Structures are given as structure tokens and as C-alpha cells.
Swiss-Prot record:
Function summary: Binds to the 23S rRNA.
Protein name: Large ribosomal subunit protein bL9
Entry superkingdom: Bacteria
Gene Ontology cellular component list: ribonucleoprotein complex; ribosome
Family: Belongs to the bacterial ribosomal protein bL9 family.
Cysteine disulfide partners in this protein: none
Length: 151
């Protein structure tokens, strides 16, 4: 089923573009949430007329993402974890743990924007990219340090 996006969806595309999606996805998610409309000739004309508005919205989203990227450029996130050897962690550090550590620093991000290729299993310093917009991906520094043992 062909749909026209009314807002940017990370896994699909940007506002104003036409996509072919599964009918169930369109009927059960995109249409009820107001994220897309069916791609009929009449709706295509309406979207063409509103194209300037969409372009303005895209520029605004990109500008906000670039401002956030500037804020994140020098961010350092320190996570304390239990270790069973000198450097091996008991569990692993996931994007959820990084999100929680950033939230503690008043940096609010969604977990899915943190592009951690695989969970971190050793102490050390890691560069982790954050996808804020399709072409805006700043990197933050994540330091994993051993938790002090209490005796």
C-alpha cells in the first residue's frame, strides 16, 4: 500500500515522501497515529501544495539536530560496572545503560538513537555514535570504569 508521510519516521523516511508499506502497518499504525495518509491522486496534489511547509519542517528538524550535535560533541559519559577480573564486566553495557547515564546528565535521548554495534563487555573508553538525524551523527565518549568494592 502506498502512503505519504506526514512526519519524519526514522525507520521509513522523511516528511512528504511516498513509500510502499505493508497494508497492516499502514492501517494499524501509520493512519491511526496520523503519521501518514494514503497516496491517492487527490492527496498527492494536497502534498504538492504543502511541499514548502514540509521543506521548512525538514530544515527545522535538521537545524535542531545540528544544535543537539554541538551540545553532544564534548559529552563524556562515565558508567560504573562490576568487574570479575581486571577488565571483564559481569554483565554488559547496552544502549539502555548509556541512555540512563545521559539522562542523569540532563541529556534526553531515545535508546534507538544510540548506535552501539554490540554491548560493551570490558572496561575502557569507547566512542559511540548517536543518530540525531539521517546525516547528523555526533560521537560521545563512554568510559566504563570498575565499581569500587566495599568491604
Amino acid at each position: 500500500m502506498k502512503v505519504i508521510l506526514k512526519e519524519t519516521i526514522d525507520t521509513l523516511g522523511i516528511v512528504g515522501t511516498e513509500w510502499d508499506v505493508a497494508p497492516g502497518y499502514a492501517r494499524n499504525y501509520l493512519f491511526p497515529q496520523g503519521k501518514a495518509i494514503e497516496a491517492t491522486p487527490q492527496n498527492r496534489k494536497i502534498i504538492q501544495q504543502a511541499k514548502a511547509k514540509f521543506d521548512l519542517q525538514i530544515a527545522k528538524e535538521r537545524k535542531l539536530a545540528q544544535e543537539m550535535a554541538e551540545r553532544l560533541k564534548n559529552v563524556e559519559c562515565t558508567i560504573k560496572a562490576k568487574v570479575h577480573e581486571e577488565f571483564r564486566l559481569y554483565g554488559s553495557i547496552t544502549s539502555h545503560d548509556i541512555k540512563d547515564a545521559l539522562n542523569a546528565q540532563n541529556i534526553i535521548l531515545e535508546r534507538r538513537t544510540i548506535l552501539l554495534p554490540e554491548p560493551i563487555r570490558e572496561t575502557g573508553e569507547y566512542k559511540v555514535p548517536i543518530r540525531l538525524y539521517k546525516d547528523v551523527e555526533p560521537e560521545i565518549t563512554v568510559k566504563v570504569v570498575p565499581e569500587e568494592k566495599t568491604q
